[in-house]
Amino acid sequence: MDILLTKNGNEIAIYEGMKLNSVNTTYISTHIDKAIKNYNPLGTATYIIAYVDAINYNDFWERYFNYLSTYKYPLPIKTLITKKKTPNAAIKAAFMVVSRDEFDFPVYFMTFNIEK
């Protein structure tokens, strides 16, 4: 976990960041598992952020979303992953809900196009 946000001593969000220039499935799966299972015993809302330096950002996003859609998550899925609208072309997002010990919590996947 890169950042743990708290309010009044309570966990409110986990932030896991990574830099990608391709859909490196091994690297991505390691970050997903860390964020939603290994470092998240309470079922805290989770944000998995990818800073993307790819030649074709839209193509990257489609391959990344396809991977996320077929990934074998380490926790039960309550709501399948769906794409979300974003405020501009340099940001893409998706959302799902997983469950830990019968407690459901959201997982947000966001990518930011940082290509120069």
Model-identified regions with their sequence ranges:
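Conserved acidic residues
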Residues: D2, I12, T44-T46
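Residue-level detector of beta-strand face positions
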Residues: D2-L4, V97
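Active-site beta-strand-loop-beta-strand hairpin of nuclease catalytic cores
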Residues: L4-I14, F103
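Short, flexible loop/turn elements at secondary-structure junctions
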Residues: K7, M18-N21, T111-N113
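Hydrophobic/aromatic beta-strand patches that form the interior of the parallel beta-sheet core
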Residues: A13-Y15, Y47-I49, Y108-M110
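Hydrophobic transmembrane alpha-helix bundles
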Residues: Y15, K19-I36, T79-F95
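Catalytic cores of nucleic-acid endonucleases
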Residues: K19-L75
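Domain-level recognition of nuclease-like catalytic cores that cleave nucleotide substrates
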Residues: Y51-K116
